[in-house]
Regions:
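C-terminal substrate-binding subdomain of Rossmann-fold SDR/epimerase-dehydratase oxidoreductases
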Residues: 1-126
């Protein structure tokens, strides 16, 4: 399971945190740091193969892949690799609490926007 987040949601989260950054750092010996770490994520983990299938559907919709694209023929499943984790999940409750922001672009919509951008930027595939 992976927590995928649309890039515009990431940018919005960063901008919100940056506009409210503390003015100055406290002395290193201080008990608390003036800066906080915030997770920015969609908080809705999905299976990697579900992500890939959804991306395939959106690429077909934008005519970047043929209608009869055979995902299985282009898929090679490997065992867990060094550094892989079984699941990732972003707890965004501090971000929502402190900045009133929670990434909200659903996976399908984010991949649809990506496919449209890709087609507009690179052009249709031949």
């Amino acid at each position: 399971m992976r927590d995928f987040t649309y890039v515009d949601d990431i940018v919005e989260g960063i901008l919100r945190v940056m506009t409210c950054a503390p003015a100055a750092a406290s002395a290193p010996e201080g008990a608390s740091a003036p800066h906080r770490v915030y997770n920015i994520g969609n908080s809705q983990p999905v299976k990697l193969l579900d992500f890939v299938r959804t991306l395939q559907q959106e690429l077909i919709r934008e005519e970047l892949l043929p209608q009869d694209h055979d995902l299985a023929a282009h898929t090679e499943l490997l065992p867990m690799q060094p550094g892989d984790v079984l699941a990732t999940y972003a707890d965004t409750s501090p971000l929502e609490r402190d900045f009133g922001f929670r990434p909200a672009t659903p996976l399908c919509e984010g991949l649809r926007r990506f496919a449209r951008w890709y087609r507009a930027f690179y052009g249709p595939q031949s």
